[in-house]
From Swiss-Prot:
Classification via InterPro entries: AceGlu_kinase-like_sf, AcgluKinase_fam, ArgB, Asp/Glu/Uridylate_kinase, Glu/AcGlu_kinase, NAGK-C
Lineage, uppermost ranks: Bacteria, Pseudomonadati, Campylobacterota, Epsilonproteobacteria, Campylobacterales
UniProt keyword annotation of Kinase present: yes
Pathway the protein contributes to: Amino-acid biosynthesis; L-arginine biosynthesis; N(2)-acetyl-L-ornithine from L-glutamate: step 2/4
Family stated for the protein in its record: Belongs to the acetylglutamate kinase family. ArgB subfamily.
Protein name (record): Acetylglutamate kinase
Organism this protein belongs to: Campylobacter hominis (strain ATCC BAA-381 / DSM 21671 / CCUG 45161 / LMG 19568 / NCTC 13146 / CH001A)
Catalytic activity annotation: N-acetyl-L-glutamate + ATP = N-acetyl-L-glutamyl 5-phosphate + ADP
Predominant localisation class: cytoplasm
Enzyme's top EC category: transferase
Length: 283
């Protein structure tokens, strides 16, 4: 009886957030362990369906680095990285596109639909969703950045109750294919839509201080200071920079959460304290 009562309390405590978030646009960057562990994948799909059922408009951008590495290794193609980005030559980009758009994207979409969603799997090439240009003058090969987002296409999908699942592959005006960093892709899409929230699923709890403790609330000024003193470093820098870019471009809140925790999205969004790090301009 106590357990049932506790469950009821949890549901009731979520009601204010459900009311607040109805009809809002949330962009979810899906990657890391949450994308490879079968139980976590199922939890993620069910959480997304629940968010959609309570009236939140969801857009998912996914990565697929582990699957890309496995496929490149299988085909005997060497992987190289610089500045945290995959150096992508002409042969590799064909494989990356095949894996992200043809395999990973459709697997995510199918799992969502099996659990009651109305998801549609697309990439940046579809309906000219994303227009790309080469990053850093071609330093990383066929790695691009987003020049333009077809906002009207995304809004049409959301209006018709779809959940877009987007593979970060796009073309430029010459119809050359580019691999886009999924964090940056999610950031550009959220910024273009002026989304209410963007959520990055990571493999750690969020931004940690020098004692390894979670910093639950950050603003751009604090982030700049933490980068200067080395508290924020390494692989967290691209994610936190993406958060700041979103906030500076009209996204109200950015979150970094641990996707290895079951139902982490619900725990972050529907509880008072959350479980990760939230970035906003003013608290």
């Amino acid at each position: 009886m106590i357990k049932k009562s506790k469950t009821a309390e949890v549901i009731i405590s979520a009601l204010p957030y459900i009311r607040k978030f109805r009809d809002k646009i949330f962009v979810i960057k899906y990657g890391g362990a949450a994308q490879t562990d079968d139980n976590l994948k199922l939890n993620f799909a069910r959480d997304i369906v629940l968010l959609h059922m309570v009236g939140i408009k969801i857009i998912i951008i996914h990565g697929g680095g582990k699957k890309i590495n496995q496929t490149l290794d299988l085909l005997g193609v060497k992987s190289e990285f610089a500045d945290g980005l995959r150096i992508t030559d002409k042969k590799s980009i064909e494989i990356v596109e095949m894996v992200l758009s043809g395999a990973v994207n459709k697997q995510i979409t199918a799992l969502l639909n099996q659990n009651g969603a109305k998801a549609i799997g697309i990439c940046g090439k579809d309906a000219n969703l994303l227009e790309a240009e080469v990053l850093s003058g071609g330093k990383y090969g066929f790695v691009g950045e987003i020049k333009n987002v077809n906002v009207n296409f995304l809004k049409d999908l959301l209006t018709n109750d779809y959940i877009p699942v987007i593979a970060p592959i796009a073309a430029n005006e010459k119809n050359e294919t580019f691999n886009i960093n999924a964090d940056l892709c999610a950031s550009k899409i959220a910024s273009a839509l002026k989304a209410d929230k963007i959520v990055f699923l990571s493999d750690i709890d969020g931004v940690l201080d020098k004692n390894g403790e979670l910093i639950s609330k950050l603003n751009p000024n604090l982030i700049e200071n933490l980068k200067k003193d080395g508290t924020i470093s390494g692989g967290m820098i691209p994610k936190i920079d993406a958060c700041v870019e979103c906030i500076e471009n009209g996204v109200k809140n950015a979150h970094i959460i641990n996707g290895k925790i079951p139902h982490s999205i619900l725990l972050e969004l529907f509880t008072d304290n959350g479980i990760g790090s939230m970035v906003k301009e003013v608290f």
